Amino acid sequence: MPELPEVETTRRGIAPHLEGQRVSRVIVRDGRLRWPVPEDLDIRLSGQRIVQVSRRAKYLLIQAEVGTLISHLGMSGNLRLVEAGLAALKHEHVDIELESGLALRYTDPRRFGAMLWSHDPHNHELLIRLGPEPLTDLFDGERLYERSRGKSIAVKPFIMDNAVVVGVGNIYATEALFAAGIDPRREARGISRARYLKLAIEIKRILAYAIERGGTTLRDFIGGDGKPGYFQQELFAYGRGGQPCKVCGTTLREIKLGQRASVYCPKCQR
């Protein structure tokens, strides 16, 4: 699943080609996504100039002169730029054609993504309850500590809760907990303020670095400029269950935690 760095990489890849451009038409080949693509999307968006491409959590917001397209990549979706009129392959569901001759093409084999229309995106039901962005001053270790009081759930699903902080998905939660030396199974309420301060620093560092490197290359992710990300080869824990820890050599353990695979080092993480 594309996580925050992948979505931000996509935003940075497509924004320069979209902002300031006028939409010539929208082609919806198959609108059966997680929520149906609006049947009148072509009417709503065609002829409008794209003002800004921004991101909130893992949602891309393509703001037009009137209204905003909210896009989510789901489990396997991607947005990339192609020449307008290029023949579509299977799973290439939507094209937003621009007067420049390019088209923003949405591909989603599993159909878990979304393309929705809103005149007030930040108050949309999918966005209004989201927590702070992790790379802003609104998120820090103090917030983690305060929100964790009384929480008996494990720390890993706690930091993956979008009401606590957005965009810390399975990959980056695993890596941040490894870097902070925290066992992902520990109860959130049992972790000290000092350790949460360290964890917040690592979340920010790892996400920022992943964005700089272009996200994490997994099976289905392609950046908005058509290039893959490069962070995967630098993972310390995620996907490395049964392999030696890169720090101490201890065999990494893989467990199920909150319905997700979680890998940790029994020596480095306490």
Swiss-Prot record:
The active site is at P2 (schiff-base intermediate with dna), E3 (proton donor), K58 (proton donor), R260 (proton donor). Keywords: DNA damage, DNA repair, DNA-binding, Glycosidase, Hydrolase, Lyase, Metal-binding, Multifunctional enzyme, Zinc, Zinc-finger. Pfam families: Fapy_DNA_glyco, H2TH, zf-FPG_IleRS. It comes from the Bacteria. Binds 1 zinc ion per subunit. Its EC number is 3.2.2.23, 4.2.99.18. GO terms for biological process: base-excision repair. It catalyses: Hydrolysis of DNA containing ring-opened 7-methylguanine residues, releasing 2,6-diamino-4-hydroxy-5-(N-methyl)formamidopyrimidine; 2'-deoxyribonucleotide-(2'-deoxyribose 5'-phosphate)-2'-deoxyribonucleotide-DNA = a 3'-end 2'-deoxyribonucleotide-(2,3-dehydro-2,3-deoxyribose 5'-phosphate)-DNA + a 5'-end 5'-phospho-2'-deoxyribonucleoside-DNA + H(+). A zinc finger (FPG-type) spans 236-270. Its cofactor is Zn(2+). DNA binds at H91, R110, K151. Gene3D superfamilies: 1.10.8.50, MutM-like, N-terminal. SUPFAM superfamilies: Glucocorticoid receptor-like (DNA-binding domain) (SSF57716), N-terminal domain of MutM-like DNA repair proteins (SSF81624), S13-like H2TH domain (SSF46946). GO terms for molecular function: 8-oxo-7,8-dihydroguanine DNA N-glycosylase activity; class I DNA-(apurinic or apyrimidinic site) endonuclease activity; damaged DNA binding; zinc ion binding. NCBIfam families: fpg, PRK01103.1. Belongs to the FPG family. Involved in base excision repair of DNA damaged by oxidation or by mutagenic agents. Acts as a DNA glycosylase that recognizes and removes damaged bases. Has a preference for oxidized purines, such as 7,8-dihydro-8-oxoguanine (8-oxoG). Has AP (apurinic/apyrimidinic) lyase activity and introduces nicks in the DNA strand. Cleaves the DNA backbone by beta-delta elimination to generate a single-strand break at the site of the removed base with both 3'- and 5'-phosphates. Monomer. This is Formamidopyrimidine-DNA glycosylase. It comes from Pseudomonas syringae pv. tomato (strain ATCC BAA-871 / DC3000). The gene is mutM.
